[in-house]
Amino acid sequence: MKRREFVKDLLLAGGSLAIAPRLDLTAAIPPPPTDIKRVLVTFMCHLDVGFTNTQAAVIAKYFDEYYPAAMKVATTMRQSGEDRYVWSTASWLLYGYLEHLTGAARNRAEQAVVKGDLAWLAVPFNLETEMLDRSMLEGAIGISQALDRRFDRMTTGAKMSDVPGHTRGVVAPFAANGVKLLDIGVNGASTVPEVPPVFVWKEPKGNSLIMMYHHGYGSVIQVPGSDLAIAVEVRNDNAGPHSLSEVAKIYADLRKQFPNAKVSAANFSEVALAVEPFKDNFPVVTEEIGDTWIYGVASDPVKVARYREVMRLRKEWVEKGIFNVGDSTDIRLLQHLLLAPEHTWGVDTKRLKDYEHYTPKALATVVNAPRFRWAESSWAEKRKDIDDAVQSLPETLRSEAEARLRALRPVVPDRAGLRAHAAGSEIETSHFTMAIDPQTGAIHRLRAKATGREWASPHHPLGLFAYQTLSQKDYADYRAAYIIAKTWWAPMDFGKPDIEKFGAKSQVWLPRVAGCWAGKLHDGFRTLIELEITDVEAERADRVAWPRRVYLDLRFPDSEPAVRIALTCLDKAANRLPEAMWLSFVPAAPEPRGWTLDKADQPISPFDVVKGGNRHMHAVTNGVFYKDAQGSFSIETLDAPAVALGERSPIYYSNDQPDLTKGLHFSLFNNAWGTNYIQWFGDDMRFRFVLRA
C-alpha cells in the first residue's frame, strides 16, 4: 500500500505510475479516436479500513472530517460554476456514516446523496475476493443495494484498488446482481496482471463484466472505439476528499489534454452506463487473474478460521431460508463480518521503526513497548470484528454461532479408547488400507478398497507437516521477480530488512513421530500421531519458533470413503523472523491438468491463469479436486484457504506454470508479508481437512 509520504517517485495521486508497464497490452485494442469529445472524471480516495491508524480511528476520521469536507467542496463547486465534485466512496462506509448520523446532520448527508454529491460503489470496500464464497459476494453487494432502495438508485459500477488481482469467481455473482463495470487500481509496487486496460471478463457460463485496469490507483483511460475517456482520480490512502484547488487543477489538466472534450464529474455507475455501449469493441479475457497478495491471509490463522466458520454458517442459514441475502439481518451481520476479508489487516508495520528485535527472545523484550502494543491492538481489533458480527445476530442464531466458534478452540486431543500403535504398520479401515510414515507421521499408504487405487506412497505423502524459515535472499529473489517500482518503501512492505543480521536462513524442517495411537470407534477408526521438531542449533541461535506440541488426528468414518484430518499446534512462541507452517499433500495423481480449484464456488483450472496473475498460490473456498480416467480425489480445507501449488514458499512468484507433481501445500501460517499483516503470532492453532477418494 503506498503512502503519500512514501511515493516520491510516483506521479501525483490519480495519475499512472511513473514506470512503464512490463508489456504493451494495447496492441489488441482498436486505437481510440484522436478526437475525444467526452471525459467523465470520478473522484475518490483510497480506503484502508486501518493502516494509517487503527480501524476505529480511520472510520472516525471519515465520519468526523472527510464526509463533511467532501460535501463542503461539492456545495462550493455547485455554487461557483458548471463543474461539479462527486465523491465516490465505499458503500459500507457511506451506509455506516448515514446510520451514525442523526437529526440535521443526517438530513444534510441525505440531501448530498440526493443531489449526487456523495455516491457509493457497488462493492463495500477493497476486498481480497478469494476469501469470499459466492453467497458472501452477493451479500457484499447487498449493502449497495440497500442504499439503492433507500435512495431509488441502481448502482452498477464498482471499484477496488491496491490488491492487484481478483478471482474470476466474482464475475457471476456481480453480474447477477446488476454490476456492469469493475475498475481495478493496482498497488504501485506490485506486478500488474497482463490484461488490457479495458476488457470484458467472461466466465464459462457466459456472465461478464466490463473491466478497467490501472497501473496505479487510477489513471486516464480512453475507451476503445468511442469518443469517451474516463479519468479516475484517487487521492492516496485515507487522505480524504480533494481540495478545491486540486479539483480545479484536475479539470484544467483534463481540458488541456482533451481540448475538444466536455469534461464532467460522474460516479462509477454513470461511467458504466457511458462505457457499456462500446462493449463489443473490447477484447475478451476468460482466464483467472488471481490475487498475488493472497499469501498474507495466512498471517492470522485464528481470525481466518473463525471467519470461515461464520461464513459457512451464514450460507447454511441463507440456504435454509432463515434469512435472505441482503435483508436487515444479513446487512447487520455483514457490516462486521466483511471486514475480515477487507484488504487491511492492521496498522502500517513500518511505523514500528524497528529492524533489530526479530528473534523470539528479542521480540519478547519489546512486545510491550507502545508501538508494538499499538500494532497488536490493531490486529486484535480485526479479530473483534468477527465477535461483533456474531453479536449482531438474533439470539438463537447468535447462540449457534458462538457454539460453533467455541468448538474451534485447540486442545490436546483425547486418547481415550486408543492404544499404542507402531507407526508404519498397516491399518485396515472400512474404506481404506492405510499406513503412517514412521519418520514424519504423514500418510504414506492410502489404498481405496472400492477401486484398489493407491493414492499415497513414500514419494506421495498426504498430510505432511513442515516448518519453514526464509532468508534475505528469498526476499531478494521475490522482489526481483515481483516488484516493478523502485521505491524506498517497497523493501519494507515486501520484505524484512536486516534479517540476515540475526541468522535468518532458508530452511525447511520436517517433524518426527513422538507417539502413535490407534483404535476402533463406534462409527469408524481413528489414528492419533504426536509430532515434534528438534534442532538444537537453530533453537540455541534463537531463529525458530515452531510449535512445541503438534498432533495429527486422523479419523476414518464408516459412512463414507473419507479421511478427516485435524492438525493441532500448541505452544508456539511469537517470532518476528519470517516463518511459515505447512500441511502438504502430494497424491499419486499423474495428470496435472486433472486438478481444479474451488474459488468463490467456481471451478478454476490452475493452468488457466493470466501472466502477471497468481499462478502459484490461491485461496480456495471449499478445496481442490482431482479427476482422471481411473478415479477422483479431493482435499477439503475448512480453516486454511491459501494453497501453494508446487513450490512450498509463501513468496515464490513466477509466470511459469505450476508443477503439481510437487504437491499442494496449504499455508497454515506465515508472517512473510510486511505492510499491515500480522508480524508475529504465538497462539495455539487447529486446522481441519477432509480427504475423499
Where in this protein do the model-derived segments appear?
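Catalytic-domain carbohydrate-binding cleft regions of carbohydrate-active enzymes
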Residues: 12-14, 29-386, 521-693
